[in-house]
């Protein structure tokens, strides 16, 4: 269905979204949606199935991964130290696999993040965070995680509290924003979350052969290719027409196989609920 603001009234019994069993999966879905708004396809992967052997230039996202098993700690530290970027949000790393809190005292990823948790505070069902890098306002839900930076740079504030950091560690970087920003965006305006992921996943976005030049909420693009051709499928799930900015113009020889959309330079207009398919030869790029 077309994306709408999904903000609901706080239940009388006080069981907020962030306390429900679905919070982790909805956080993952919110991050996926925010990255997909740039016209790219993020990969969802189970930790043991992920290839950790070559982290250089790669980015992983841990969205509200409340239980972080001890077997993953060294892999995550190595991933960043050897050139990867790790983004952690929400209550990621609150427990280990035995439900022991690992954020207090000797946090195993403290050197990697360059910071540690001071405390989590319940603020409001929905509130906003001021982010410096990128310069945007992030929606958040229920809790804010307050950080005590060691060597990390503060990138987000809530009042006088540091609630987001980035830290160069070895050859890589760790970005930590321990508030439920994906759930905040899920129930409200997701633009700030899309801007956040657009900044910290920029390398992966720019490596795509074609992507959106600005986030397009409710629009998806998928690319397929053969050795000689490329095919782009664009779907607008909004109830109204949208103008999509592309990272580069489609080749003049691109053929429209489906839909009514016509590209004009670096933009394409899609009607309400429209699907458009374009095919072109790679040598024309």
What are the language-model segments listed below?
Residues 63-285:
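A conserved amphipathic helix/loop scaffold
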């Amino acid at each position: 269905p077309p994306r709408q603001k999904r903000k609901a009234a706080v239940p009388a019994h006080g069981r907020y979204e962030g306390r429900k069993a679905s919070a982790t999966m909805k956080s993952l879905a919110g991050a996926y949606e925010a990255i997909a708004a740039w016209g790219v396809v993020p990969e969802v992967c189970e930790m043991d199935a992920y290839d950790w052997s070559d982290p250089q230039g790669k980015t992983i996202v841990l969205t509200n991964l409340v239980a972080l098993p001890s077997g993953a700690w060294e892999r995550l530290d190595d991933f960043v130290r050897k050139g990867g970027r790790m983004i952690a949000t929400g209550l990621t790393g609150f427990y280990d696999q035995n439900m022991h809190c690992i954020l207090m005292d000797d946090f195993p990823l403290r050197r990697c993040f360059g910071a540690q948790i001071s405390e989590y505070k319940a603020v409001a069902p929905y509130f906003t965070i001021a982010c410096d890098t990128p310069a945007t306002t992030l929606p958040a839900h229920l809790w804010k995680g307050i950080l005590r930076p060691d060597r990390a740079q503060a990138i987000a504030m809530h009042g006088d509290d540091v609630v987001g950091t980035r830290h160069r560690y070895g050859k890589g970087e760790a970005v930590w924003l321990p508030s439920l920003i994906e759930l905040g965006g899920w129930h409200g305006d997701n633009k700030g979350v899309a801007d956040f992921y657009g900044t910290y996943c920029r390398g992966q976005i720019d490596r795509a052969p074609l992507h959106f030049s600005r986030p397009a909420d409710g629009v998806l693009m998928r690319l397929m290719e053969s050795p000689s051709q490329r095919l782009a499928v664009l779907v607008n799930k909004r109830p109204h027409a949208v103008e999509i900015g592309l990272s580069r113009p489609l080749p003049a020889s691109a053929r429209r196989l489906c839909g009514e959309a016509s590209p004009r330079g670096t933009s394409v207009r899609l009607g309400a609920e429209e699907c458009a398919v374009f095919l072109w030869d790679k040598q024309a790029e």
